[in-house]
Amino acid sequence: MTTAKSMEKIVALAKSRGFIFPGSEIYGGLANTWDYGPLGVELKNNVKKAWWKKFIQQSPYNVGLDSAILMNPTTWEASGHIGGFSDPLMDCKKCRARFRADKLIEDHFAKDGEDTIVDGWSNEQMASFIDEKAIVCPECDAKEFTDIRQFNLMFKTHQGVNEDTSTEIFLRPETAQGIFVNFKNVQRTARKKIPFGIGQIGKSFRNEITPGNYTFRTREFEQMELEFFCKPGDDLEWFDYWSNFCKKWLLDLSMKETSIRLRAHTEEELSHYSNATTDIEFKFPFGWGELWGIADRTDFDLKQHTEHSGVQLIYQDPVTNEKYVPYCIEPSLGADRVTLAFLVDAYEEEQIDEKDSRIVLKLHPALAPFKAAVLPLTKKLKEQSLELFEKLSDKFMIDYDDAGSIGKRYRRHDEIGTPYCITYDFDTLEDNCVTVRDRDTMEQQRVAIDELEVFLEEKIKF
């Protein structure tokens, strides 16, 4: 039997067990910043490794890249970020609190159990709706707001010692543009033929008006993006391919199918350059939220950078000699969001019997921070247990834990998602076998020490 999960419980567990801490906590923190602790950094790194393995390492089409965070500012003129990367901002006239107009409207619908997206609404449409429905300020319940205005989301800074418009640069708001400007370099040096993709993992920055919901929406975040280039006319077929591939990646990592949905964008929501966009959304305790945006960006980006740079970003077919600007399919995934989703999805509270219950993170073993924990039955077996730890930790992330009773150690490792607990007992001295406990079933079996590496390799396969 399991009980309902809440963000409060998950946030509390994440802090108490060392997954996620508030940023700069000893100085009172900094709003909406989070630090990944010892277990959190392992979990997030495992998520990134799993993405890289399937999207880059095991793909015959794709190669990797690590582009700079700081780019020539003309990049952002070409991409449209300087002119059009903004959110609709409004202030409460009474308490001066600041809000995104579209989110106020979406929250209004959510209270009535409706799921409505207002992307594509004009400022006038949003203002009219807020007036008509008498939507109030969430902070003070006042009904008077300023006019809606657009607020650019890019963080601005300066390069060098002078601070004027000539030295103005930006922290990148997405990793994608670093891929587009390197299209020619990568295609030539990797000797890639269409279709092929370029993927990268990296930090991006957006000066969000209303960040929130823990690590779901932050101003500093990490993306895992693939730009997949194909021949015009083949784009919708590849769009379907990558949409299904992304969903399968989540399910293969043990995310529950009931926890996700694919939502196609309406015509009103679609960007002007997009042929199609589908979001893979996850059901968080606070509602459905986007994990993955999969977009058919057509040839918009390469054409824009060709126009602004003067460099022809085209492809010439080596067989037919046909020249064209490739279309691009972009699966863009937030590393922080999907890490949070795996944490939420894995969290369970189980009532084992009338007197006993437990919290358990049923993470896929490939994602679990520790693949196993070595537990000596008593501290008298510490020396031999540490030898086993050293042997296994050469290949796996292993914890060594000798504090408290075996039962308490089991529960501790259930809470942090360790799939296997390996107990070194006095029988081990005689038969060279250990007791391996399965996190999910709590069943135990004896396994020879010489077979442990193969056992773990088989269990954590992805």
UniProtKB/Swiss-Prot annotation:
Q: GO: which molecular function terms?
A: ATP binding; catalytic activity, acting on a protein; glycine-tRNA ligase activity; protein dimerization activity; transferase activity
Catalytic activity annotation:
tRNA(Gly) + glycine + ATP = glycyl-tRNA(Gly) + AMP + diphosphate
EC number(s) given by UniProt: 6.1.1.14
Task: Give any Pfam family that matches.
Answer: HGTP_anticodon
GO biological process terms on file: glycyl-tRNA aminoacylation
Q: Name one GO cellular component term.
A: cytoplasm
Q: Where in the cell is it found?
A: Cytoplasm
Q: Keywords on this record?
A: Aminoacyl-tRNA synthetase, ATP-binding, Cytoplasm, Ligase, Nucleotide-binding, Protein biosynthesis
Question: Where do the annotations place ATP binding?
Answer: 206-208, 216-221, 290-291, 334-337
- Which residues does the record give as substrate binding sites? R100, E174, F221, E222, Q223, M224, E225, E330, P331, S332, L333, G334
Q: What is its main location?
A: cytoplasm
- Record note on quaternary structure: Homodimer.
Q: What does this protein do?
A: Catalyzes the attachment of glycine to tRNA(Gly).
The record's comment on protein family reads:
Belongs to the class-II aminoacyl-tRNA synthetase family.
State the name under which the record lists this protein: Glycine--tRNA ligase
Q: From which source organism is this entry? A: Alkaliphilus metalliredigens (strain QYMF)
Q: Supply the gene name.
A: glyQS
